[in-house]
Amino acid sequence: MTKMEMGQSQHHEFWTIGLNVHGHDCRLPKSSLCWKTFYPLVDTQLVRRQPRPRLPKFTTIGQWYWGGSVEVNGTFPDLSKKIAFEPYLDLPKRIPEARFELAMNIKAEDSEKARLRERGWHIVDPHRVARTPSAYRRYMAGALAEFTAIKGVDVAWRTGWLSDRAAAFLALGRPVITEDTGAEKYIPWGSGFRFVRDAREAETAVKEVLWDWARLSKEARNGAVEIFDSAENLRRILAL
């Protein structure tokens, strides 16, 4: 994005969900573009808080493998979820009372699926559980919370990136346990997030969700409405 790629020369403004793009600790390459930041959006009128699910499930939806390539300091690092999740794979054994699930693109014959199952992870097909927008929301509502790891470049470069998927989980009343990309300082405490840096912190966050879900669920919903609501954010972006 420092080389005017993807037709940027035709744009008048440049917006990013990298909340920390102007932070002193952000390690993104310096750019001549004047980036403005905004929060990921969720329609909080469409995506409503849902009752507590039956199973103590922690899940996320994404691509386990990533076939793209991004040059970082002259190298092309592996930006897959496979690499990102590696430090957390023992969580099912450390917290047997929780169900850890991944809706990821891992084929039945892939040895990676067997490896994850041996570590206690449940694997489901994202093209089945999230095949439509309504199915996507139902699947997320079936979890107590989102647990996810972030591609390494966002963590290492302190971009402040957050996903719109996280905003949707919050709107459903589902707390979000995720790695900190530098976004934590832009999110008020008590907004449904638990930012973690290693497996020990993740274990603490999961256990907190298990024993104090009702409070955290309410915080998550309030955080979605107050921070990520699409109508409010679009008004700010358009200066209405």
Residue ranges: model-predicted function:
Residues 1-38:
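Active-site-proximal region of nucleotide-activated glycan assembly enzymes
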Residues 5-6, 49-50, 185:
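Short secondary-structure boundary/capping segments
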Residues 6, 92-93, 210:
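N-terminal cationic-hydrophobic initiation segments that often serve targeting/anchoring roles
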Residues 8-9, 30, 95-97, 118, ...:
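Short, well-ordered coil/turn elements that cap or connect secondary structure elements
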Residues 13-17, 59-61, 99-105, 147-148, ...:
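A structural signal for short, well-ordered beta-strand segments and their strand-loop junctions
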Residues 18-22, 105-111, 179-183:
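Short, polar loop motifs at secondary-structure junctions
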Residues 27-142, 153:
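Conserved catalytic-core segment of nucleotide-activated headgroup transferases in glycan assembly
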Residues 79-82, 86, 112-240:
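Catalytic binding pocket for nucleotide-activated donors in carbohydrate/polymer assembly enzymes
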